[in-house]
Amino acid sequence: MPLTEEQIARYSRQIIIPKMGGRAQERLLGSRIVLIASRQDLEEPLAYLVGAGVGDIDLCVPESDDASLRSLCEKMRDLNPDSTVSYGSLAQVPDLVFALLGSAEVVRFAAAEAPSVGPAVVARLDAPGKIALLPAPPPCIRCAAGGLLDSFGERREHAGFIAMLATTEALKILGAYDNAGAAALFRFDGLRTIAEPIADSKRRCACSPA
């Protein structure tokens, strides 16, 4: 659906980004995403997605505090009426699964509740922080995602920064920005404040295709 004048004004800061434009914004408004995270890691990335104009966002949260999540959904509706934020129902197939893994509890919950469809953006919020871009579900996520499901270590102060980097990658995929969507794995170096790509080791496991 073409953007209205009000929407052009609302999203003008991102529409003018080279290779973004109105078409990418229309894709964002028509997209559906599942956001998996603990309550403490949820609000800032969610506000970023809503502010950018992602059309439908389903929250997948381990904690069952309905009042808190209901209040958060109302807050996001006030932030941007173009976005619909809901929780408790994952009936429709999303365009993207976005997971912020801050603890083993979130991993277990995601494995049980989240739809196993691609593409996906998965971020580890402990140390060392990692972000994986998965265009399709790997045959064996433990091997293919480079340790994303290894034992969790100490939570670091850069967890929020990792979440913001991952949110940017999610928006690039949803908006089909440039070459977004290619499989990749990054490790965050907090001392140098950079995200370094991790080379594909080409390893195979028993469940991988030949």
Please identify what each model-predicted range represents.
Residues 1-210:
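Adenine nucleotide-associated cytosolic modules
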